[in-house]
From Swiss-Prot:
The species this protein was found in: Arabidopsis thaliana (Mouse-ear cress)
Known glycosylation sites: N60, N130, N170, N238, N285, N304
Protein topology in the membrane: Single-pass type I membrane protein
Residue spans, topological domain Cytoplasmic: 400-793
Tree of life domain: Eukaryota
Protein's name according to its UniProt entry: Wall-associated receptor kinase-like 18
Region of interest (Atypical EGF-like), residue spans: 312-371
Pfam families per UniProt: GUB_WAK_bind, PK_Tyr_Ser-Thr, WAK
Reactions this protein catalyses: L-seryl-[protein] + ATP = O-phospho-L-seryl-[protein] + ADP + H(+); L-threonyl-[protein] + ATP = O-phospho-L-threonyl-[protein] + ADP + H(+)
Function: Serine/threonine-protein kinase that may function as a signaling receptor of extracellular matrix component.
Family to which the UniProt record says this protein belongs: Belongs to the protein kinase superfamily. Ser/Thr protein kinase family.
């Protein structure tokens, strides 16, 4: 028993080895000839094919081109295809129809003709195609094509008994209708030009591809045919004249459309037509079929079972009463079923056809595919929606920001125009060559420098606005003057300050760094003067600054006089400050004076001696002659400087209260009265009385008296004042102090003096004995506000 078992195992292993040799025999053979693939069971040479019917001869032509020939019929091969090779991607067909397809080999057959003459001899008729006993048959993809005149072409040896078409070159309507191919109703399901089989009582016209006069075609029946002949009959029985190339008829798998083609020499010049031959496997090849049975499943069993693991199936088919085998790859596979593992999986997810819906993901597996609803797609859709909403919100936010920025830009342009930007440009252009380029700051830069104009940054309040301390991005400390809300009538004052400061380049005048006109109220940027204003150092009660001794005060007076002298005579055009006061005198780190606040300044031409304007100024500093005439001259600045000299000498504010009375008088009047009564020592500031040089103080006091003269003509100009004060300051000995101005006691003025009487009351009002003129004054504090009175006459 064991010996028999051993023998069976041996023969089984030997049989499997032989099968493997059979299947892999093709691998060692040439599989291409002339660029045409030669799949198994075909092969080049006897040892590389299944049997003689599949032998291919690779012949070298005269043009040195390799041409494959099917040795069995000695015809040139155009292509060889495997079963189902063209149907695996046509997934709309059923599995049964797919596996009933056959392998095809396309070969070249000569075009046959009848009734043609070449060199005086009539060419032979068409030959019969006979593949009986071979594994080949004529595929139904071929058609009968006929071209010529007055002929009837039909196929022989097929069922139904007669299939063909008629040719006519007559252009009449009746003859044209006869040339159209037709099929008899109730006969074949295939569209045939005509049939004369029994049971087909009527003929129905059916248009086909070649339906013009002189051309017709007919389709083959569905059943595989191994024998086909072509018969041509002449329908023109009365004609005795032979015409050249009457009929050309042939089988081909190509498409022809030859309307009105009556000359067949063009077809004969082609010499051949391609014909598709189906091929199967003869059942006499038992060993080969048995080997296929191990790899492929029987087709009937495959259709009746749910086990679809096999990659290929084989079935039997009868052709001309002979049984053949036909194999093919199963659904989901493609390749050569006649080679071991020749059927390969199709990746349906990579083909162009969409198998799954938009919300599904295609997943390929061996022999098929499945559509999986992607759970991540919902997340992706949600994320995409969220991202879209985010983009939308971001877009709206950006649009809002853009619109706000655009609105701010328009507002800035509006403010620039309203704040006199155009006027400033015009003024600067008219003074081109004399005006240094002024930097234009943007509002954001100044907001950042002043911490958004914080109250903690306020340095002081002036007549035209508030001054803030700020720091620029480059580290420079600046003073930002933010003007008050002003009407268009006051814009000229602001622009005037910018233009004037742009012209000035003097060490004792505050330097203008730039301006900003794009805000609701205009702003100026000055250099920052660290020690504040002169008023604070002289008049604040808690101030006992030792630096404000007489020597420092005298030097400050010289600095102020030098600056005013420069403005009146040395600048590009004379400039009248019009608001000289101690709060507008700033002290730097070395306590050197700098003149500031040019908001009410005016520039005049050289030939002008005064400027007629509405009265403006600060109580206690305004020239009384200016009150009367409304004409501001350089001597008006001299008068205001005289008040500052009186402040430096006495330490009193420009408006003082008379002791033991309710009256408030101007310091200028009080100083003049004391000088006339020779009581200077009584009014000298107690803080400098013991330290000063009396001769210097007296000399400066006499200069102040001249500056405070009620008549402008009797006042010296600022150059004379500066020269005199500088000489007083630099005199090494007290005996050398000499007043250039006459030291003789002035004659008592004949003209009517303007006497200022200030009654102290709840309203702190001031009445001035001037022609029908009244003004309102601010409280005498460190925050002295300029007044803008108007003449009422």
């Amino acid at each position: 028993m064991s010996n028999e078992s051993t023998n069976c195992s041996f023969f089984l292993n030997l049989f499997m080895l032989l099968l493997l040799l059979i299947f892999y025999s093709a691998d060692a053979c040439q599989r291409e000839c002339g660029g045409i693939s030669i799949p198994y069971p075909f092969g080049i040479g006897k040892d590389c094919c299944l049997e003689k019917y599949y032998e291919i001869e690779c012949r070298n032509t005269t043009s040195r081109k390799l041409v494959p020939l099917l040795s069995f019929i000695n015809k040139e091969v155009v292509s060889i295809s495997l079963p189902s090779a063209d149907s695996h991607f046509a997934y709309e067909v059923s599995d049964q129809e797919r596996h009933e397809s056959f392998g095809l080999v396309r070969v070249k057959f000569p075009i046959t003709s009848a009734g043609c003459f070449n060199d005086g001899k009539e060419s032979g008729g068409g030959s019969k195609m006979n593949f009986t006993g071979s594994p080949f048959f004529i595929d139904r993809s071929n058609s009968l094509i006929a071209a010529g005149c007055n002929s009837k072409v039909s196929l022989m040896y097929i069922k139904p008994k007669m299939v063909g078409c008629e040719l006519s070159c007559n252009t009449s309507k009746d003859s044209y209708s006869n040339s159209i191919p037709f099929v008899e109703a109730g006969c074949s399901s295939n569209v045939l030009p005509y049939s004369q089989d029994q049971g087909c009582p009527e003929e129905i016209a059916e248009e086909t591809g070649c339906n013009g006069i002189g051309c017709c075609q007919a389709s083959l029946p569905n059943e595989p045919q191994q024998v086909i002949g072509i018969r041509t009959e002449n329908n023109d029985g009365n004609s005795t004249t032979k015409v050249e190339c009457t009929v050309s008829a042939f089988l081909t798998d190509e498409i022809y459309a030859l309307p009105k083609a009556t000359k067949t020499e063009h077809l004969l010049a082609k010499r051949y037509a391609t014909v598709s031959l189906g091929w199967v496997i003869q059942t006499s090849n038992r060993s080969f079929l048995d080997s296929l049975a191990l790899a492929c499943k029987d087709r009937e069993d495959y259709r009746n079972t749910t086990n679809l693991e096999r990659k290929c199936t084989c079935g039997r088919i009868t052709i001309s009463e002979t049984s053949y085998a036909n194999c093919g790859c199963t659904y989901g596979y493609t390749g050569n079923p006649y080679v071991l593992n020749g059927c390969k999986d199709i990746d349906e997810c990579k083909v162009k056809f969409e198998y799954c819906g938009k919300t599904e993901t295609c997943v390929n597996f061996e022999g098929g595919y499945r559509c999986v609803r992607d759970k991540t797609k919902a997340i992706m859709i949600g994320a995409g929606t969220g991202f879209g909403v985010l983009v939308l919100v971001g877009g709206l936010w950006w649009l809002r920001k853009f619109l706000i920025k655009r609105r701010i830009t328009k507002r800035k342009k509006k403010f620039f125009k309203r704040n006199g930007g155009l006027l400033l440009l015009q003024e600067l252009n008219t003074r081109e060559g004399y005006v240094e380029k002024t930097r234009v700051f943007n509002s954001r830069e100044l907001e950042k420098a002043t911490e958004n104009f914080s109250e903690n940054r306020v340095l002081g309040h002036g007549g035209q606005g508030t001054v803030y301390k700020g720091m620029l991005v480059d580290g420079r400390t600046v003073a930002v003057k933010k003007s008050k809300v002003i009407d268009e009538d006051k814009l000229q004052e602001f622009i005037n300050e910018v233009v004037i400061l742009s012209q000035i380049n003097h060490r004792h005048v505050v330097k203008l760094l730039g301006c900003c006109l794009e805000t609701e109220v205009p702003m100026l940027v000055y250099e920052f003067i660290i020690n504040g204003n002169l008023f604070k150092h002289i008049h604040e009660e808690e101030s006992d600054d030792y630096t404000m001794l007489w020597g420092m005060r005298l030097r400050i007076a010289v600095d102020i006089a030098g600056a005013l002298s420069y403005l009146h005579s040395s600048a590009s055009s004379p400039i009248y400050h019009r608001d000289i006061k101690s709060t507008n005198i700033l002290l730097d780190e070395k306590y050197r004076a700098k003149v500031a606040d040019f908001g009410t300044s005016r520039s005049v031409t050289i030939d002008q001696t005064h400027w007629t304007t509405v009265i403006s100024g600060t109580v206690g500093y305004v020239d009384p002659e200016y009150y009367q005439s409304s004409q501001y001259t350089e001597k008006s600045d001299v008068y205001s400087f005289g008040v500052i000299l009186a402040e430096l000498i006495t330490g009193d504010k420009p408006v003082i209260m008379v002791q033991n009375t309710q009256e408030i008088v101007a310091l200028a009047e009080h100083f003049r009265v004391a000088m006339k009564e020779k009581r200077l020592t009584d009014i000298i500031d107690a803080r400098i009385r013991n330290d000063c040089k009396p001769e210097q103080v007296m000399a400066v006091a006499k200069v102040a008296m001249k500056c405070l003269s009620s008549k402008g003509k009797k006042r010296p100009n600022m150059r004379e004042v500066f020269t005199e004060l500088e000489r007083i300051c630099t005199s090494p000995e007290d005996s050398q102090v000499h007043n250039r101005i006459d030291e003789e006691e002035e004659e008592e003025e004949e003209e009517e003096e303007v006497v200022t009487t200030i009654n102290r009351g709840d309203s702190w009002s001031i009445s001035v004995t001037a022609p029908a003129l009244s003004i309102v004054a601010s409280s005498p504090s460190s925050d002295v506000e300029p007044l803008f009175p108007r003449l009422t006459w």
